[in-house]
Amino acid sequence: MISPKSLMKIATTASVAAITVYVAVVPAYAMQDIAIEDTPSSFAATVDDAQNSSNSMPDNPNATLPETVSENISDDSTVVSENLAVTPEGDVQNIETGETVTDAQLVGTQSQQPDPLAKTDGESFIPVSASDVKDAVEQSVKQSVEQSSSKNGATVKLAKFDGNDYGAHWGTYNNTKAFFDYRNNLFAQQAKGVIDVSSWQGDIDWAKAKADGVEGAIIRLGFGWGNDADAKAQRNINECKRLGIPFGIYWYSYAEDASGSRQEGNDVVSKLRQFGVSPNDLRYPVYYDLESWTWTGHTPPTNPNVYNGIVNAWYGALQSGGYQNLGVYSYTSYLQGPLNNANIYAKTRWVAQYGPQMEFTAFGTNDRGWQYTSSGQINGISGSVDMSAFGVKELSQNVPIYRMYNRNSGLHHYTANYDEALDLSLKGWLAEGISFFAAREGNPVYRVYNPHDGNHHYTKDSEEKNYLVSLGWRDEGIGWFVPDKGKANVYRLYNPYSGDHVFTEDLEEYNSAGSVGWHKEGIAWQSN
């Protein structure tokens, strides 16, 4: 509703972060809108150069195989890092020696969950069966023997792939940046490059990271329940807010049942509030990280129905706390095993797959994320960082038009450009959400600018546009397109005191503003 006070300010319940888009990570040189055939070969190799290397872990192309696997490691154990395996009973063993690991930093205690990234020194690792690792080690030994005569006994590692025929890669689709698998099958369009980070990355220089092409971040808030938050979560959140980097949150689960996940959910809500993160601050979801965890005296669930209850309880806690934008994160083999449940699939929006293609195809939403490498390199970050591509499978025909409000001048601004809206919000403008939806093609709506008072105006009438230009307004081209026959009327209001125009679908707002002095100028156009 438009407030009578000053006849200018439009009431808003949205914050800056109400401008919502689905976005996602790549090396800086790959974060360019480039054609598929022009994708740098080195980037294709970054994604997949080690996938077929003779000394790489299955499903983890950047993790090195052990030289040998102890006979004490059973085939049904799970390898959780380059040097650790977990038995079905939950005991952690050294892969090469078979000795049981008791370091509380790695396995926790009966009452204390360990940092899940401690086992891998902060890097992501997709758990794989010990049987597969044994097969890979055996194959690696055979390849080394076959190649040793021509390589003077040196350790052999296959060269990087030449071009992008073999690796997942960035390109363009429908004139938007997109991410493809190694066969050029589209994973997502309108795609963004996103990193996920934790305290293991230390103090990140977020300004450098943003300048290097980072378009979003998923920040670890914590793990389990009753633990401290991630030591760098507050700093990472503050920096993303300061620099206008869209961000989301992830929380690693140690839940054995719905009771545990409910506690985890309550912990997430508590820490989000503690760190000043409102639902409107989150451009990406709060992700529930479900993996095969290791915790002394405890074992992760294996029944999908149990996990379904875990997910529902966590969702309930977050939703009760006011956080609705949620998602599940996991890796393909776990989704095809303990998480194989239709309800969980419907909530899965981010998947780790360190290979040439995404093998999980049951995304329940149009938006999706592919964490495609754990060894990305970004300026401002020491060491490796996970990279993901976030986007949508199908391109929406609806173009959101963002409404911004300047509290100092009392003027409103409308734009189809999300980056422009974000830039204005960083300069102090209030984001009043999406005013209406335009179309991708149709009748042009022209945008003109008054350099004397900073006012913008938007009109479908080319004669009105030309007349204003003749008076000194600047022609800024086409702002967006609208259909001949749309779903709803968009009304035009004029403030005779400020010269401001407001465009709204809300008939109640239109009539209310008219009752307090705004000029009701009828239907401007229809929304898509």
Name each model-derived stretch.
Residues 1-13, 29:
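Bacterial Sec-dependent N-terminal signal peptides
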Residues 179-311, 321:
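Substrate-binding cleft of extracellular glycoside hydrolase catalytic domains
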Residues 193-196, 215-220, 225, 246-251, ...:
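Structural recognition of the beta-strand scaffold that forms the well-ordered cores
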Residues 199-203, 216, 222-227, 247, ...:
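Solvent-exposed loop/turn segments at secondary-structure junctions
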Residues 279-361:
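Catalytic domains of cell-wall/extracellular-matrix polysaccharide-remodeling enzymes
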Residues 397-528:
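Trp/Gly-enriched beta-strand/coil motifs that build multi-repeat beta-propeller-like domains
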